[in-house]
Amino acid sequence: MKHIFIVNPAAGKSDRTAEYREMIDAAFAPRGLSYELLVSGAPGECRTLARQAAQSGEEVRLYACGGDGTLNEVINGVVGYDNAAVTHFPGGSGNDTIKIFDDPAAFTSIERLLDAEEARFDLIRCNDSYALNVLSIGFDARVGTDIARFKRLPLVSGKGAYILSIFSNMLHGLTADYTVTLDSGKVFSGRKTMICVCNGRWYGGGFNPVPEAEPDDGLLDVLVVEKVNLLQVATVVGHYQKGRLSLIHISEPTRP
């Protein structure tokens, strides 16, 4: 098997490429194994590098070194290639995807990633792209778009950037008109705050909107958040973060 590490030097708050190389060398040298380390130079290039590796036809394990966005790019690069497996060596600010698994700490050890068995997981398809974890639409998606600029602030964590972006976007309107149709035939239409399609459970620096979601059960868990006003936002965000929106009757988690 070929081992390829794809590094996003822009992930997190500093370039960790040299640190990654030291850790990889320490794990691979005693085993007499070789590897390649590829560094992305532009947004979207991790996907291109992953696709090129998969197209070689060799059995390959790709290690996405960066944040959740880096992992997403690498996954999108290998969809449809059975010779390629993907894992994650986290180096972002949120690193939420690994929280799907029983032992997230295992992903911080190169040795344990080398020894790990492969498993198959579901993906969310949106137009021509795929997601492993969560797909959000509406207010939350706008919040996610603005997170990057808040992450640049000193002493702001991934979760802190998410919270700041929430309150910034509150000033630009909370709702929009949507129609959501599930495979079951159930339809949600009208003014909605956001729609969250969950294959995994954690995102946004620690938000857990649907605790029941499992990435290998063949189902997507859909959470539709109804229209809320500014006075409700703080309560909604708190319940949304903890996966308790159904308790305040403004959402309906369903499985298509």
Residue ranges: model-predicted function:
Residues T70-Y81:
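Short Gly/Thr/Asp-enriched flexible loops that form oxyanion-binding sites at enzyme active sites
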Residues P9, C65-G67, F89-G92:
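Glycine-rich beta-strand-to-loop/alpha-helix junction loops that act as flexible
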Residues M1-L62, N72:
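ATP/NTP phosphate-donor binding region
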Residues M194-K242:
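Internal helical hairpin/lid segments
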Residues D15-R16, E73-I75, I98-I100, G206-F207, ...:
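Short glycine-/acidic-enriched loop or helix-start segments at secondary-structure transitions
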Residues R31, S40, G80-C196:
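Catalytic core of DAGKc-family lipid kinases
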